[in-house]
Amino acid sequence: RQSEKSGLKDILQTLRESPIHQWNNCEGEDGSLFVESKLENFCRKAVSEFKYEIEAKDILHTKILAYTNTRVNNYNKAIHKLLWNDDNFLHKGEILMAYENFKKDGYEVTNSMDYIVEEFTPTIIDVPYYTKCKGYLVKLYDEYNNASFKIPLLAPEECNEDLAIVIETIRTEAINSQGYDRKKKWSIYYDLMGSFCTSKDLFTDGRCIRKATFKYGYAITTHRSQGSSYDNVFIDMKDIFRAKDKETLRQLQYVSMSRTRSDITMLL
């Protein structure tokens, strides 16, 4: 990913052998590291890059990488708020990342892929064997396949335990059924699961019954970023330092530092 003129080359070479505990600015013609100590400045710089990404419809322009899911969720909420400066759930141009595979009307949403919100319309989603729910008919753009498709996305307040209980009840009934009744119950289960997407994990009794289909796509875990490349990467090294195992820390540092094609801004 880095050229011979990248200032990150020697850093990556070191990270192949051992983790790094002291970080400093490092500039190169084709790639530089900028260390930032203030979270506010780190987020402000990231927002500037995301504004370009949204304008250019370039989902591989920039990404924030962190270690923990909690930190990723906090970044996604913060960047969403800073970008749009209102309380609306969705906006035209919003970047959404898929957190599960989902098939609908011939289109397939792929786990860990980014999608761009082209338009959305408030609607009522008829969730079979449950009730009618508030939601949105969202038109998403798939940059990789140069195609658009629509998905039914539940409003956040509809992603609750009541729905999780219905899903788990039907699933349990299907598991415990026999013969034709078993086949029928599984058909009911898949009809239900295929009727909507969610922006939140659905829980009951402390267990995740269904993972979120989509979340905001501004920040992801370093683990989820493997295999991806971005023009610019923002790394929360403070969060990555939570990994106390030496080899785990080295791997996280190497993966995060090698995602960029040019520059890295690091929070330390």
What are these regions (language model features)?
Residues 131-268:
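C-terminal accessory regions
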